[in-house]
Amino acid sequence: MNNILVINGPNLNLLGKREPDIYGNITLENINQKIKLHFKNEDLKIDFFQSNEEGKIIDKIIESEKKYNAIVINPAAYSHYSIAILDAMRSINIPVVEVHLSNIYKREEYRKKSVTAEASLGVISGFGYYGYIMAIEFILNNLVREK
């Protein structure tokens, strides 16, 4: 069985209320339910973690190597400046795919750079919650090929 951890960064717990013109009306809980439903027939366990605190996200990334085959991460605002999260991602030996709900390249100038992307297999941006599903599909296909 594959185990995948989905990490969500700061303010994503406010989805559904925060900037619905950018992020829509869907809540983080709804996103998590849609992900689980999409993969219900897979031999797959998906855990979800959200924190507004950089240190807790770093700890979760570092601990993940013991329990998970891969990480899907939406570092949110931390993606633009957190060298600490980048270093944590680089320190583990499991694949990481970065996801952003909105298209960061159509947003403010400071959002167009993701430092954490340097430690990711790839970045999926602008497809809403479906970006998480795309990331997990990629990971599953990648893990199957490696076996």
Swiss-Prot record:
The active site is at Y23, H100. InterPro entries: DHquinase_II (IPR001874), DHquinase_II_CS (IPR018509), DHquinase_II_sf (IPR036441). It comes from the Bacteria. It catalyses: 3-dehydroquinate = 3-dehydroshikimate + H2O. GO terms for molecular function: 3-dehydroquinate dehydratase activity. GO terms for biological process: amino acid biosynthetic process; aromatic amino acid family biosynthetic process; chorismate biosynthetic process; quinate catabolic process. Substrate binds at N74, H80, D87, L101, S102, R111. Keywords: Amino-acid biosynthesis, Aromatic amino acid biosynthesis, Lyase. It holds the Pfam family DHquinase_II. Its EC number is 4.2.1.10. The keyword Amino-acid biosynthesis applies. Pathway: Metabolic intermediate biosynthesis; chorismate biosynthesis; chorismate from D-erythrose 4-phosphate and phosphoenolpyruvate: step 3/7. The record marks R18 as: Transition state stabilizer. Belongs to the type-II 3-dehydroquinase family. Homododecamer. Catalyzes a trans-dehydration via an enolate intermediate. This is 3-dehydroquinate dehydratase. It comes from Clostridium botulinum (strain Kyoto / Type A2). The gene is aroQ.
